[in-house]
Amino acid sequence: MRTFEITEKEVAAAFREAESGEAKKILAALFCKEEMVKPTLDDYKTIRTYEDACKALGEPIFEDPNNLPNHIIALMKLETISRALWGRNFQPKPDGEGSKVYWYPWFALWTQKEVEDMNPEQRGALLSADANGGATAGFGSLHAYSRSSLAGADFGFRLCQETEEKAKYFGQQFIELWAEYLKFNFTVGNRLK
């Protein structure tokens, strides 16, 4: 087995010359400290924090002079991150004809065991039932009409992504922000602490 000696300067030059996002990821994984991978609108996986999203978009980091509620600040940050994850060329537009598919981020704030260990009042507040359009609340909402179940996406378009992969990344990479945005008066699962 041969050993190669590569200087940091050579790695930096190779990184600048790499044309594909995949090549840059490989170089970064092999040679770079995590901080050296700069956030870019060309590769959504370089957006790892809210600050990365601001940097990639060229926007200032939000400072709250008005003491807004934490869930509002979290939503504002999620919207910024969503725009950064869309990338440079993607401009989502609502599609009234339904010809486009957008993916809402998915994640789990509680494990199955944590839900099972909740008392009935906590579980009832977490998962609600529908009173025919009058009482949908909580994080999950159960519907029963002409079929045994119905799934619906009634809100949150600006947080959607154009691929399932990006939506999964958005939900899991930024799970703490999602928890802050959605938890209201709940304590989220222990694994997020």
Give names to the regions the model predicted:
Residues 1-77:
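Charge-rich, low-complexity N-terminal segments
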Residues 1-2, 188-193:
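Short intrinsically disordered terminal tails
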Residues 99-108, 113-156:
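Short aromatic-glycine-(Arg/Gly/Cys) micro-motifs in beta-strand/loop hairpins
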Residues 162-177:
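A short, charged, amphipathic alpha-helix used as a generic interaction element across diverse proteins
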Residues 65-122:
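Acidic, glycine-rich loop-and-strand cores that form catalytic or ligand-binding grooves
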Residues 174-187:
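ADP-ribosyltransferase catalytic core
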